[in-house]
Amino acid sequence: DIEMAKEGAKRMGKEIKLQPIDWDAKDMELEAGTIDCIWNGFTMNGREEDYTWTAPYMDNSQVVVTKADSGITTLEDLAGKIVEVQKESSAQSALEDKDHADLLASFKEFLMVDQYNTAFMDLESGAVDAIGIDIGVAKFQLQGKEEEFTILDEPISSEQYAVGFLKGNDELCDEVEKTLKEMEADGTFAKISDSYFGYDVSILGE
């Protein structure tokens, strides 16, 4: 996010100031004009009407990974299965959310490990049937293993990141979005993304 913001500001001919804030005070900061936008893995889902947003630039949905030959194709197929997540991860939070109470109750076992590397070893060995995980981490871990494992089409929860502005600040929002799309079109977004994630995380063109 920081590299993207720096590159975006440079292209727009603006000086950038990276301002850490108290997250609980973000709305006050925007309203007071002490910050112009929030560009920090800011989830737009559930907040669509609270801010003026750019188009979403990254998907951080929580998904399920299984072995390709497991026969598991939907979340309902996880009934009676052993599901593993990283302790204190977004996937754990999503599965423990009240919206997924029935899904969680259907598992044979719900296990937690300290690292996703351990979870993938457990999946590979057959110790567990599925892993709940961020889509970005899943795609990175599955590079070169696409025939062995699969990501279910149905996410546990959908989460997209966008740049958020004070409601009504359309002019600056539109300028930032235009610049983001230019960075996506000329490959800059992909280059920055690849240096951190090992692949292009952009969903701007979708």
Each language-model region and where it sits:
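Ligand-binding cleft/hinge of the Venus flytrap
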Residues: 5-14, 91-112, 142-146
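Alpha-to-beta junction loops
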Residues: 13-15, 31-40, 81-82, 115, ...
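General small-molecule cofactor/ligand-binding pocket signal
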Residues: 17-19, 111, 152
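Solvent-exposed loop/turn segments at secondary-structure junctions
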Residues: 24-25, 43-47, 70-71, 89-93, ...
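Extended ligand-binding regions for polar small-molecule ligands
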Residues: 2-11, 76, 81-82, 87-90, ...
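Acidic, polar ligand-binding/catalytic clefts
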Residues: 2, 6, 10, 15-77
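Periplasmic-binding protein-like
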Residues: 59-66, 135-139, 143-181, 197-206
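A ligand-binding cleft/hinge motif common to bilobed small-molecule-binding domains
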Residues: 25, 41-50, 94-97, 122-158
